[in-house]
Amino acid sequence: MYVFVDRLSDSVSIPFVSKRAYRKRVNLDDDEDDFVDDPSPTEQKTKAEKKMERMGYKAGEGLGKNKQGIQEPIAISFREGKAGLGHEQWDDSTENKTVEETVIWMTNIDEGIRREICDKLIKDDQWMVVRKEKKVIDDETKFCSEKKLKDMLEAKNVFDSMSEKDIREARTRANPYETIGSAFFLNRSAMKTANMDKIYDWILSRENTGNNSFLLKNPLQEGTTAENVDRHEDLFYFADVCAGPGGFSEYMLWRKAFYNAKGFGFTLAGKDDFKLQKFTASSAYFFETFYGTKKNGDVMDPENIDSLEKLISEGTDGQGVHLMMADGAFSVQGQENIQEILSKRLYLCQLLVSLCIVREGGNFLCNLFDIFTPFSVGLIYLMRVCYDSISLHKPHTSRPANSERFVVCKGLRIECARVVKEYLKRVNRKLDELKNKNSKDDVMELMPLDVIKSDEQFMKEIIEHNEVLAHRQTVYLQKYKSFAKNQGQFDKDQGNLRDECLKYWQVPNKQRPRGGDRGSHLRRGRMGNKFPEFSISMLQSKIPLNIPYEEYRFVALGAASDPQLLIGTGDAVFIYRHGHFEQIDRDYARIPENTILLVDCAEEVKTDGSKIRISSDPHMIRIVDAAVLYGDNVSQLPYEARMKAAQKFALALKLTKKTIQIGWGFRAKDITPHQVCCAQTYSLKELDEFQSNLIELKQRGEVIVLFKEGDRQFKTQSLRLTRIIKQDWQMGWSKSQQVPYVHSPLHQKEGSILEDQWKKREIHSSFWDSVILTNKDKQKMTEMMQHGHNAVPSTIWSWKPCMRTEYGPYKIMNHPEAFDGKPTISAIKSQIAETDLSTQPSNYFY
C-alpha cells in the first residue's frame, strides 16, 4: 500500500515503513488506529478474564440473563494539567451532521466534445505541456477562490506548534463519525467502501437491492443463517490497486458473500502489503495478489502497468473487471500543502490503470486529495471523456479535517478509454524519463486550460466542489484546535451517529471476530462401505417405459484411487485417505473454511506426439461433487445444480498465475499451490461428446486413454456415475407429455410425478446419498438389487487394465459389445438404443 499518515490532516506517509513503527512518530493516519493485530489464540488468559468467563462472559456480549450488560469497559475520566479550564465550548451549529448523504454527479460531457478530444489525442501529444516543475500551491486559484484556499492552508499551519498526541486525541473526540471505526473489518477503508456503496445506490458492488433479498447473504441480525441468493449469478470481478492491507477488498468479498466475487490485488510489496491472513469477514482465497513484472507492486512503473493489464485480461477471459478501487498515497512529510503536486503521477497512474483493466460499462472508485492544479483537473476532465458519468464526493467515513475525497466513475466507454489510455501511457513514460534524468522539468498540463475553461458547466461544478470541501475542512481544523485546547470536550453525537450510519449502510453492528472457525457441516457416517462397481445391469429395467440410463450423470476420474472427501476448516484442510483424515498444507490447498467436497486428486498430463509426460505441478483438485461451498450448503440440491455451483466456486478460486508469493522480505518465497477445478459432467446420452474429448495413445505396448477438460489433459482411470434421483424412485418417459417422470413400487399412492414437481417432492438425491453408505443403506440397497431394482446411488466404472484378462482401455473404447460381461462404450450405447426402442410402442402410457 501507499500508506496514509496525516500530519493534520493531509495524508502523509513513509513508504516501506510499517504503520505500527511509523505511528510512534506521526500518529494521524486516516486508518492507523484500526489496524491492530488480533490477540494470539494461545495467549494466556488473565485471572480477571477467567473469572469473567465463569460468570458467563463471551467476547462481544454483555453479562446478564439476556446479555443486556455493557460490552465496553467503563471509560476512564481524565484531565491533563489545566487544559480545558476557561476555554470556550465549540459551537455545533457550524457543522452539518447527517446520516444520509447527497451525492452530486457532474454534468455529462457533450458527445461532440468527447469525440473531438479523442480525435485530438490520437493524432499527437501537443496537449502534453512540459516545463519547469512547480513546488507551490498557494497561487492555484483557477479552480478555487483565493480566500477559501488561504483559509484552509492557514488552518493547517496553526497545528505546527501543537504536539501530535494532542492533535490525535482531539481528532478522536471531535470527529462526529470517529467511533464508526472499522466495525468488524480489517481497517477503516472497508467502511469507506460500505459508505460509498450505499450512497451511490450500490453501483460499486452491483447488488440487486429491489426487495432487499441481498441482505439474506449478510443478515443484519446476528445469529441468522446466511443464504446464498446469488448462487446462480455470474461471478463478480474486481481489482484493488494501491490498497494494502486490503480493507476495500475485504468489504467487497463480504458484501458479495460466499463465492460470488473474485478479486485481484496490486500494491507495494513489503511490510505494507495486503494482510490477507487478517481477513475475517471473508476468505482471502477469493483474492489473487500480483506485483507486476518488477515484483515490487509499483503502480507508477510502465512495465508493471502493462503486466497488470495482461494479467487481468487473462483472469477475466478478456473482459476486464466490473469494478476497480484505488487507494494510493505516499510520504509527503514536511510538504503537506503541496501533496497534490507530489502525488500527480500517482493520480495519473491509478486513473490510467482503470482504463486498462475495467470492462465495458464497468465502474471505478479512487481516492484523491486536493485538486487545485490544471494537471489534476485535466485528469478529472479526461475521466469524463472515458466514462458515462463521474462524481466527486467526500463520505462521512473520510475524516472531515483532511483533504481526502473520492472520484466515482460510472460506465466505462471502451472506445474512448483505449484512446485516452494510450495517451496517458505516453505521459507516464515521459514522467519516467524526466525522473530518470533527474530533470527539473515536469509535465504540467494534460490538456489546454482554455479547453477546460470553455466548458463553463464543468468549471462551475469543479469550483463549487473544491470550495465546499475547503470550507468544511477549515471548519473541522478549527474544531480540532478547539478540542485540543479543551480536553474535556467530546462530540455528543458520536454514539448515535455510529449506530444510525451502520444501519443506513446495511452493515451489522458487531465486533470483529478473533480467529477462524474449525466447525464444519460434516455429518457422521461410516466411510468404510463402498458402492458396487458399475455394470450394464444398472441400466436395465423390466418395465418397458423406464429409462434407467437417464437416472445417471458421470464424470471422468484422473486419479488411480476413488474420489476422496475433502474438508476445509478455519485453519486447515483435511482429506480422507486410507481410512482416516490427513491434513494438507493450507498454503498449497487454497480451500476456504466451511467447505466439504468430493474430489479427484489427478495429475495433469502433457503430451508431445505419442509421448506422455506427467506435469511437475502439484496435482489438480477436481471437484466431482459438493456438499458445502464456503458455508453455502448445496448438499440437498440436484446433482447438476451442485456441480454448477461448484463450477462457480472453482472459478472464484482460480489462480491466473500458477505461482504465488508467501511471506515478504528475506522470508518471501514463491510456491505453486494445487489448482482447483470442477469436473465436466455428462449424461450417458452424451457419450459421443465425451468420446470426442478422449485421446488414445500407446506407451510401451499399453493403450492409455487421456481425457481433455478445457486446456488440461488427464489419464482416464475410471468414470464415476452418480444417480440423480433417490434410490426408492425409478425414472420413466411420458409419451403423452414427452417429459420424464418418476414412480415407485414403494410409494404407489404417490403415483407418477412429473419433472417439474421433483424439487417440491424431494425426489433428487443428495450429496450424502451418493457419498456416505451406512450399514443400513447398504442392506437396503442389497435387498433392492435382489428384487431386480439395480438403482445404486453412485458407482465407479474402472478403466484400468485387468491383469487377468484383456479388459481395459482398449476393449472399453473399441470392442463392439460387452467384454466378458463387463461394460464397454458400444455396449452402453446399444443398451440406451434398446431402452429408447422400448418406449416407442403406442400402447404404453402411464
UniProtKB/Swiss-Prot annotation:
Residues 44-90 form the G-patch domain. InterPro entries: G_patch_dom, mRNA_Cap_2O-Ribose_MeTrfase, RNA_MeTrfase_FtsJ_dom, RrmJ-type_MeTrfase, SAM-dependent_MTases_sf. One of its GO terms (molecular function) is nucleic acid binding. Residues 30-50 are annotated as: Disordered. SUPFAM superfamilies: S-adenosyl-L-methionine-dependent methyltransferases. GO terms for cellular component: cytoplasm; nucleus. Disulfide bonds: none annotated. This is Inactive cap-specific mRNA (nucleoside-2'-O-)-methyltransferase 1B. It comes from the Eukaryota. GO terms for biological process: 7-methylguanosine mRNA capping; methylation; mRNA processing. Residues 184-413 form the RrmJ-type SAM-dependent 2'-O-MTase domain.
